[in-house]
Amino acid sequence: MARVTVEDCVDKVPNRFELVLLAAHRAREISAGAAITVDRDNDKNPVVSLREIADETQSADDLRERLIEANQTQIEVDEPEEDQMALLMGAESDRPVEDDMSEERLLRALMEAQGQG
């Protein structure tokens, strides 16, 4: 039965590789619970999908669009933070400069500030 169905579909989708992609996608839709547009006649989902394409109850163009939509992914691009953006653009950041001061130097500076030095 499937061989005859493939021969019937070649008129609607001339490229057999594309036909396989479309029929497989439609079979997955049927497995996911989509309504069948032809009588099942105890056939499995791939054969039903080929029969739908052959009978033109499923348009090849519509199937193609749904296949493309199903395979498209949206990639979110994270924007860098403002500080990182400034550094990437070559500007200096607004952060205070951190001074690596030893504990001894810090105590001396505090004592000098208080006038005990």
From Swiss-Prot:
Q: Name one Pfam family in it.
A: RNA_pol_Rpb6
| GO BP term (any one) | DNA-templated transcription
Judged by the first EC level, this protein's enzyme class is transferase
Sample GO molecular function, one term: DNA binding
Give the EC number(s) listed in the UniProt record. Answer: 2.7.7.6
- State the family it belongs to: Belongs to the RNA polymerase subunit omega family.
Q: How does it assemble?
A: The RNAP catalytic core consists of 2 alpha, 1 beta, 1 beta' and 1 omega subunit. When a sigma factor is associated with the core the holoenzyme is formed, which can initiate transcription.
NCBIfam families in the record: rpoZ (TIGR00690)
Identification of the protein by name: DNA-directed RNA polymerase subunit omega
The taxonomy runs: Bacteria, Pseudomonadati, Pseudomonadota, Alphaproteobacteria, Rhodobacterales
